[in-house]
Amino acid sequence: MEFQNLIEKRRSVRKYAEGNTVTKDEILSMIKAAQEAPSWKNSQTGRYYCIMDTKDVDQFRRECLSEMNAGKCENAVLLVSTFVHNRAGFQKDGTADNELGNGWGCYDLGLQNENLILKAEELGYGTLIMGIRDADKIREFCSVPETETVVA
């Protein structure tokens, strides 16, 4: 699929068909595409946590998402995206390069997530980026280290 077609075709999906199975290799392909995005000094601070098992997805929906969003990811594979703090936008001694500081990690993750969702579209899968969630519960559920920020 040509890039312009991907951009024009891609939409946020709020209902997923039952039985539409995403493979581990396809998930890895999406993450590889995400990792090709540029980042601050090539720091590559984005991280992904994948939930594929139906029982785990259902538990995650109940425990970590608002009621509004929980219904939107039924029959879906879930990817949690995070970034490592104090690397993108920072010097080796830990001082911020400018006023944005950790904002650069979030910016870089946005670039990565764009690549990921466009790759998903190319593979025939719809996506929905959800910001309304309980970051603390996600951190616990996915064992996300305190050195990372849960974004979506």
Kindly label every feature range from the protein language model.
Residues 59, 141-152:
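Short basic, glycine-rich beta-strand/loop surfaces that mediate nucleic-acid
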Residues 72, 122, 145-147:
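Arginine/glycine-rich "motif VI" loop of SF2 helicases in the C-terminal RecA-like domain
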Residues 1-28, 150-151:
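Specificity-determining recognition surfaces
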Residues 22, 52-55, 133-134:
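Short beta->alpha linker loops
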Residues 26-28, 32, 36-110:
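Glycine/small-residue-rich phosphate/adenosyl-binding loop
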